[in-house]
Amino acid sequence: LVIDLTGMDIANASLLDEATAAAEAVGLAQRVTKNNSKKIFVSETCNPQTINLIKTRIEPFGLELIVGNQKDFLKSEKSELICGVIAYPDTLGDIADPSEAISQIRKKGGKAIVICDLLSLAKLKTPAELGADIAVGNAQRFGVPMGYGGPHAAFFATKEEFKRSMPGRIIGVSVDRFGKKAYRLSLQTREQHIRRDKATSNICTAQALLAIVSAAYAIYHGPKGILNIANRTSKLAKLFADKIKIAGYELHSDNFFDTVTVKTKDKTDEIYRKAIAEKVNLRKINNQIISVAFDEAKRLDHVNLLLKIFGVKEVINKSTDVKLENIPQELLRSSKYLTHPVFNKYHSETEMMRYLKKLEDSDIALNRSMIALGSCTMKLNATAEMIPISWKEFSLPHPFVPINQMKGYQILFNDLIKDLKEITGFDAVSLQPNSGAQGEYAGLMTIRAFHKNNNESNRDVCLIPNSAHGTNPASAQMSGMKVVVVNCDENGNIDLEDLKNKSKKYSKDLAALMVTYPSTHGVFEEKIIEICNIIHTNGGQVYMDGANLNALVGIAKPGKFGPDVCHINLHKTFCIPHGGGGPGMGPIACAKHLEEFLPTHHHLQNSKLTKGVGSVSAAPWGSASILVISWMYIKMMGSKGLKLASQISILNANYISKKLSEKYKVLYTGKNGNVAHECIIDIRPIKEKTGITEEDIAKRLIDYGYHAPTMSWPVSGTIMIEPTESENLEEINKFCNALLNIKDEIDKIDSGSFEKKDNPMINAPHTYLELSSDEWKHSYSRQEAAFPKKYLKDHKYWAPVARVDNVYGDRNLVCSCPSMDEYKDEAA
């Protein structure tokens, strides 16, 4: 979808919002641009939220942000640039040919970043055709409600040559061991979980679920439907513009797609008041100009209401044929898009339903079995919690409507903030960060602003344990901090002596310690209070990664045992669905002395946060509509229920730890022999003895109907298991028995009962095509391959593909839909 509409070579699997996508594009440009420039140009006609977020992002690196008129600046500027960011169409709806600006940016050695509207690209020439290096934007209008700010998927597309510098997840095509096409995460060595502070971004959670919705929207409508929607939207804008001009108004531009900006002059305030009285929100640019945007959901009666508001008496009785001369002829698109059969096949609700069901059947999701991903907290997302997100009161509002119209939302925000403060023991909360990694970044930027306010800008060293999430060092780097790694001891705790030595060594420059509690090793850090005291004694602040908060809620409050700020993964502890990689929300909670430095936003004109770090998300409250899920969870559970959930999550993890310790080595426990809410199983002794790896075990679990646990993190050669409180004893026993049975299979390899080069472990997962083939080439039986436990005969999950060739996928990177010819070859 994104590759076709932008014309670029490669696209990632989504980003958080348009503003952060633009900031990530600036980051890519900085990585790949060969000159020594410190200058970044952003056109003043970009959206204000985008300009402000880019300003926040580049500030720690001493780069110069120039916001101005793109024509004048690019013509007069003689020095080199890192990049130039331009909008197409721009924030006022104007469509100007950006090719000259793109050419000027590239002549100055910079990369040309074009922020574009995905629907308009059904009508307009692609950014690629105009010479852009990077295209970004928001896919919200492809089937996703506004949601008072989100969630919706941003997109990021660029040239093939920049693929190894791209931010975010990339889904690529590979093959399984039979040569069948398979999808996988590609080029992961760019990402934070591997490259840490050298990663291309700190992205972990993005907006995968919303990207799927937008892709499904395009599949359902197809190229003809998308073009019809684009034409209808533009037609309404043109009808309005024509009548306005006849009535004597002057337009800001006659070239537009869906946004008409009118020079209202001395009538501005009167028109704006009339609009509010009619429950219509218009964008008042200043005292002279009002901007009107049409979307795909508007109708002719909306146009007539607008004409009435603008004092135009004539009514349009029917949608007459209108020539869409509002798009310059030279910018009209001629290239084809969405030509793949998947976009041209499923255009009835029946067929679309069956196609989506077919895709669902390929997944191991929580509606099928327990997902034991360590450090992910894959708990139940209860239906009652999620119903309100479908209500129009939550789903329809625009993020920049007047705040006095959103009293219900404000009550919800304040209520949630109050609850999160009570749960964490902190004094203030910002709901703006729209992922856990963004929460980390926001928290560290808040600490940075605190030090700067104390005239200690030199404090830029961030101590991070070697067990930390990869997002920690990546976020520290984004905040302009230098990462210094602290060792852990043999029990999984922070090495206190190493921490003392490094805190003392860097005491003059120490900004922060990032610590996860309970630790990523699955144990409660026994000396957490002393650890915090060491940092404070040496002038630093303590950032607590709240990834494992599910083991603390109702039991202990981070704000009371030492940390100064933490983020809260609402998509983990507080029940927002993970969505296969988003949406998420990562609010931050902090102590009183950091409150005034929390993120601000240009929409909040009366904010008390005068020293705030600027915006970290496009919308003031991030992905606001999904906050209702966490609100519902907290209210339904109550304080006793929240505490019980934490207790059961710890109990379940310890039950699994004890049960699996019969045949596996549990790597870390506390001094009492217990774990926190997750446990790490050491596979290294097994590999040393039999050659079987953690990946083999993860693949074999698929044959048993289970999603893989977290592999090789935080310790290489291990698997990490987190059951959450949502699983009952029957399901936990079933999962444990699957792993114990797998250990028996491994023992059979060791004893010679299974061949080392042909056994159920190294050939897993087994597909129904292999099981149903006329010829069975293995030394073990079909029964041993596919039905190692009796329950599988009643309800069996079949992997859609066999073992995937990871090396092939990275060496032969393909990130667009494979042609249908290849599928035909497979079936032949």
Regions inferred by a protein language model and the residue ranges of each:
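Short acidic-aromatic active-site loops that bind/stabilize oxyanions
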Residues: 1, 15, 87, 91, ...
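Short loop-beta-helix segment that forms the pyridoxal 5′-phosphate
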Residues: 4-23, 420-445
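Non-catalytic terminal extensions of PLP-dependent enzymes
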Residues: 4-5, 178, 193-204, 211-429, ...
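General small-molecule cofactor/ligand-binding pocket signal
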Residues: 11, 64-68, 252, 283, ...
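Short glycine-centered, acidic/aromatic-flanked micro-motifs in structured strand/loop junctions
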Residues: 12, 42-44, 86-88, 294-296, ...
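Conserved PLP-enzyme active-site core in the AAT-like
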Residues: 20-32, 36-182, 244, 261-262, ...
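Proline/glycine-anchored alpha-helix kink/cap motifs
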Residues: 26-34, 209-219, 626, 630-634
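Conserved phosphate/anionic-ligand binding catalytic regions in large, soluble enzymes, centered on
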Residues: 144-157, 161-162, 206-210, 298, ...
